[in-house]
């Protein structure tokens, strides 16, 4: 091997070897245990960022480790290639989304290869190709035929100036990002998949996911939001009954008004002859409210003039349109109990409505609703026959009475809504439905799929090219003229089943069941926690759809889930003439730090003093991203990978520090130097355990302890940073160890082979070279080192000796020494015997192998 470590030469050579030998190409092998490792596939934005590098390094470390465990490992990669950014970039760069996307894929593919990730490139695909989305389209039509797909009107962001639908991220402060026109809410027909049919199973099966972070499971439980309650009817004079859902039927006797959503049919009827109410309803509709903001937003409402009749006591209560009632949740109507619900309380206080308390504290303390509602569960009063009942008894009794009178029923409700998959964008998979002239909607027959998205288009930045081109929509169905659906699928559709397509990317169907059932479920999935409620939930749903269609036998797609932390970096800015912040790249800033490493001054390349905004997530908007390419060019891929795995636990945030990268580079140089010095002296003989001295045994014990710890850290705990720290600690001992005798060299040889094998998943290129230099063959197919139980056995033990609770000495005894032998040596230790002079020993306690405690007075 060369004397100097030169990453560029080594990495290019090793990557060429992997390419030529198709090292990471796999097929199904029933004789081997399989391991499917997958990192969330990237959106081809143009260049890799450090978040990608972290995600894919973790995946590659897990894959290579499992490979050395003798498993048949599949690690695929592909491209989540549809989406809005491509449309925006196409408009900006005067091109079409397709060429922009394909160019980015080529560039990023090359970057991934330079980082040495062991992907099976034979399985690569981009979701924007008809070969991929054709199967999604066909599966959608099958779901339609099963009754799991339907169309209904739903609200979208509408720009009246551009006459176009906007995605949520295109609405800035309530206005269109392009022309600054106030955005309206518009009801348009959209396609939905009935995820709610699977709500209970999606909830129950979270308990099967033992390898998932508890936090992600909790987020999904809350998102699914199962609740038990009562659905009841209020009669409305001269109108249809009003249905409401409540989880607190115990408060029913405290209802003083009913709130309905602006989109509720009753609201529309009430507004017909009430211009003021009609205007208020419009205002509500155009104020898009996120559910999270409901608690803090200003509560507004207007009386409809309608009156509802309480189902049990017959009291008349007013019906209000209220901005905090959402049509998408429950029935779009709520029974309001101001005394026992804070939102209802604020509304009633504002509009001078009655507040009637009917629940008091169980402990008998005084009820106080002067400032806020009493929302705890308690004991009923002023509730007629239900007085004195506590929550559960009242729930059951009131529900039973409502059921007996035909006015209500116990029911389970879910917060989860059906999945709206229509997008009024161009760059997505066309929805395979047509409408004939008689208004009937039909799925496109399988023999006419895929419905291909035209790629040679001109983007005007306003209207989708397939909506603008009236000819594109014209087609036939059973020989009759028909119009195609011009909406495209939500891009979560493509990412909900891509993991399964990797199992058989060439299959002439959505999946090849035999191959899919060999590889699935994914054994290890890696990605950001921001995907907890959307992508991860939709993928679980899609997997169950595939199972029920007979394609897979498993219930869940991902066995283990690791959510990697974000990558942070220093961010700097100066204030421009208009008072805005101009962000300066940290690579263009010179900083001075105090003794504790805190930044005391920062000056950019223009000589300007800049403010340090702290360590924050790397992003384009803060201009604090570090280009992985530059780091690879400067230090090599192995150094970047090592820093990524060492600087922080995989699931915690990682602070980017170039000094840390330099440290990782120095460590690799040290390992290289020691291997080079060792191999330059020729081959070493085998370890003869029986012939080792005490010091040699101790060093060899350290080697095998390290193997045991690293194996556990990587395989079970997934604390890769502590595994690396253990190898570094061992390297420090090896560097200082004598190399005089043949057995000294034998131990070092065994140790270096173990070190190289343990570092291989993290830094594969340098380890490939060092492995060969150590006289070994083909590290990619080697075995993970195993520790020798015998080597871990200690001949001697270090025992701490205490007198009256204070440490007075340490003694070395034979590992199998008896209590009497230890006592004799301990009592005669020089410092111990000094402290026993002139006192009476009352008790001697021996904790085997650890402690001798003497009590004396």
From Swiss-Prot:
EC number(s) per entry: 6.1.1.4
UniProt-listed GO biological process terms: leucyl-tRNA aminoacylation
Gene3D superfamilies: 2.20.28.290, 3.10.20.590, HUPs, Isoleucyl-tRNA Synthetase, Domain 1, Valyl/Leucyl/Isoleucyl-tRNA synthetase, editing domain
Presence of the UniProt keyword Cytoplasm in the record: yes
Keyword terms: Aminoacyl-tRNA synthetase, ATP-binding, Cytoplasm, Ligase, Nucleotide-binding, Protein biosynthesis
Record-level Gene Ontology MF annotations: aminoacyl-tRNA deacylase activity; ATP binding; leucine-tRNA ligase activity
Entry binding sites for ATP: 620
Domain of life: Bacteria
Short sequence motif named 'HIGH' region, residue ranges: 42-52
GO CC terms in record: cytosol
Motif ('KMSKS' region): 617-621
CDD domains associated with the record: Anticodon_Ia_Leu_BEm (cd07958), LeuRS_core (cd00812)
Family (UniProt): Belongs to the class-I aminoacyl-tRNA synthetase family.
HAMAP family tied to this protein: Leu_tRNA_synth_B
Protein name: Leucine--tRNA ligase
Natural source organism: Vibrio vulnificus (strain CMCP6)
């Amino acid at each position: 091997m060369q004397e100097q470590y030169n990453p560029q030469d080594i990495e290019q050579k090793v990557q060429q070897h992997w390419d030529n030998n198709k090292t990471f190409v796999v097929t199904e092998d029933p004789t081997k245990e399989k391991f499917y490792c997958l990192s969330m596939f990237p959106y081809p934005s143009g260049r890799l960022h450090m978040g990608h590098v972290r995600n894919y390094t973790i995946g590659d470390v897990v894959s290579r480790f499992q490979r050395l465990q003798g498993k048949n490992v599949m690690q695929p990669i592909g491209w989540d290639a549809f989406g809005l950014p491509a449309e925006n970039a196409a408009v900006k760069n005067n091109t079409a989304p397709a060429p922009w996307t394909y160019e980015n894929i080529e560039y990023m593919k090359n970057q991934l290869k330079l980082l040495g990730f062991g992907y099976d490139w034979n399985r690569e695909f981009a979701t924007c190709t008809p070969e991929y989305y054709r199967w999604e389209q066909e599966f959608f039509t099958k779901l339609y035929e099963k009754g799991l797909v339907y169309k209904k009107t739903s609200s979208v962001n509408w720009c009246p100036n551009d006459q176009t639908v906007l995605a949520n991220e295109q609405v800035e402060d309530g206005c269109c990002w392009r022309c600054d026109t106030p955005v309206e809410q518009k009801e348009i027909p959209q396609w939905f998949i009935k995820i709610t049919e699977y709500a209970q199973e999606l909830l129950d099966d979270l308990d099967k996911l033992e390898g998932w972070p508890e936090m992600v499971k909790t987020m999904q439980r809350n998102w699914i939001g199962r609740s038990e309650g009562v659905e009841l009817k209020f009669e409305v004079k001269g109108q249809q009954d009003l249905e409401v859902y409540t989880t607190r039927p115990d408060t029913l006797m405290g209802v003083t008004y009913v709130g309905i959503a602006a989109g509720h049919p009753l609201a529309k009827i009430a507004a017909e002859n009430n211009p003021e109410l009609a205007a208020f309803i419009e205002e509500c509709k155009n104020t898009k409210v996120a559910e999270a903001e409901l608690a803090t937003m200003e509560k507004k409402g207007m009386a409809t003039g309608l009156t509802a009749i309480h189902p049990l006591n017959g009291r008349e209560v007013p019906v209000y349109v209220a901005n905090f009632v959402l049509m998408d949740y429950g029935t779009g109507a709520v029974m309001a109990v101001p005394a026992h619900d804070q939102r209802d309380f604020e509304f009633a206080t504002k509009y001078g409505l009655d507040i009637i308390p009917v629940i008091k504290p169980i402990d008998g303390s005084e009820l106080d609703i002067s400032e806020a509602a009493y929302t705890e569960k308690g004991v009923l009063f002023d509730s007629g026959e239900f007085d004195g009942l506590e929550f559960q008894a009242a729930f059951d009794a009131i529900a039973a009475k409502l059921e007996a009178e035909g006015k209500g029923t116990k029911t389970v409700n879910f917060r989860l809504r059906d999945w709206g998959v229509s997008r009024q964008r161009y760059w997505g998979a066309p929805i395979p439905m047509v409408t004939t002239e008689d208004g009937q909607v039909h799925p496109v027959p399988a023999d006419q799929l895929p419905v291909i998205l035209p790629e040679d288009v001109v983007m005007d930045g306003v209207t989708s090219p397939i909506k603008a081109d009236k000819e594109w929509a014209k087609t036939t169905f059973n020989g009759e003229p028909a119009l195609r659906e011009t909406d495209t699928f939500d891009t979560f559709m493509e990412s909900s089943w891509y993991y399964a397509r990797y199992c058989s990317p060439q299959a002439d169907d959505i999946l090849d069941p035999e191959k899919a059932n060999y590889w699935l479920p994914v054994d290890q999935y890696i990605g950001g926690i921001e995907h907890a409620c959307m992508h991860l939930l939709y993928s679980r749903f899609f997997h169950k759809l595939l199972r029920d269609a007979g394609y897979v036998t498993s219930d869940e797609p991902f066995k283990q889930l690791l959510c990697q932390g974000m990558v942070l970096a220093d961010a700097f800015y100066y204030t421009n003439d208009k008072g805005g912040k101009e962000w300066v790249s940290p690579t263009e800033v010179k900083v001075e730090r105090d003794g504790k490493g805190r930044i005391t001054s920062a000056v950019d390349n223009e000589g300007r003093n800049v403010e340090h905004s702290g360590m924050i997530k790397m992003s384009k908007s803060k201009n604090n991203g570090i280009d992985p390419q530059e780091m690879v060019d400067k230090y090599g891929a192995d150094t970047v990978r090592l820093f990524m795995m060492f600087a922080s636990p995989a699931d915690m945030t990682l602070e980017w520090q170039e000094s840390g990268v330099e440290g990782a580079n120095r460590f690799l140089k040290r390992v290289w130097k020691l291997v080079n010095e060792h191999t330059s002296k020729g081959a070493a003989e085998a370890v003869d355990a029986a012939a080792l001295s005490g010091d040699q045994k101790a060093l060899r014990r350290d080697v095998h302890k390290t193997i045991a710890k690293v194996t556990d850290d990587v395989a079970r705990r997934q604390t890769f940073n502590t595994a690396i720290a253990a190898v570094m600690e061992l390297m420090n001992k090896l560097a200082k160890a004598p190399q005089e005798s043949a057995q000294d060299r034998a131990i070092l040889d065994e140790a270096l082979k173990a070190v190289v094998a343990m570092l291989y998943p993290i830094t594969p290129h340098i380890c490939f070279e060092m492995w060969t230099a150590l006289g070994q063959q083909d590290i990619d197919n080697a075995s993970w080192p195993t520790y020798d139980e015998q080597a871990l056995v200690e001949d001697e033990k270090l025992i701490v000796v205490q007198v009256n609770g204070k440490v007075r000495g340490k003694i070395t005894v034979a590992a199998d020494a008896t209590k009497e032998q230890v006592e004799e040596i301990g009592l005669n230790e020089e410092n111990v015997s000094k402290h026993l002079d002139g006192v009476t020993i009352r008790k001697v306690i021996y904790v085997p192998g650890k402690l001798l405690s003497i009590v004396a007075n």
